[in-house]
Amino acid sequence: IIGLVLGYFEGLTDAIGARLLDTLMAFPFIVLVTMTLVAIGPSNLTVILVIGIAYAPLVARTVRAAVREQKQRDYVSAARLGGEGALAIMFLEILPNIRETILIELVTRLGYAFFSIATLSFLGLGIQPPSADWGLAVADGYGFLTGGKWWVVLFNSGAIVSLVMATNLIAQGIGAFENSDA
């Protein structure tokens, strides 16, 4: 919704919102998430919320760009001339036309979120025991590397990589499916 509003309304709203998004995106992701989790304390819900909030500016920026592109189209001008208000144009006209972009962005970020959760769990800041997490499993198996038992880490790491790759392939598939309809 933030990206939708910033993309539709130009001027001061867009300028302030875009600079705020740029500021949030300027912080290194892992540093921002780590500092927040250290300050708040790790729990399953906290980890998910912090990662979701950390990825929100990236999604908002993508949606903003898509809205700005769609806003120049004739169907938006026709809706304005037809007397539709800003909310109706944003939610009934523009939003359905950028659903593919939003869906691809969300699925891609979901894969990155899985990797981020595993990374934080490996560092001891993510999902906490006794909850099951691949990052915790990699951290537990890390000590076995010196004993020559590399497969303990390999299979769990491979599962993480496979999940991230699968979400990226799903996002590409969504894009290919949507583009084949056009």
Task: Label the predicted regions.
Residues 51-54, 100, 104-108, 149-182:
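C-terminal transmembrane helix and the adjacent membrane-cytosol boundary/short C-terminal tail
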Residues 25, 36-39, 66-67, 116-155, ...:
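Glycine-rich helix-loop "coupling/hinge" segments at transmembrane-helix boundaries
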Residues 4, 33-38, 47, 51, ...:
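Transmembrane alpha-helix boundary and packing residues in multipass membrane permease domains
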Residues 87-120, 167:
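Transmembrane alpha-helices
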Residues 12-20, 94, 134-137, 141, ...:
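Hydrophobic alpha-helical segments of integral membrane proteins
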Residues 2, 7-69:
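Generic hydrophobic transmembrane alpha-helix motif, especially the helices
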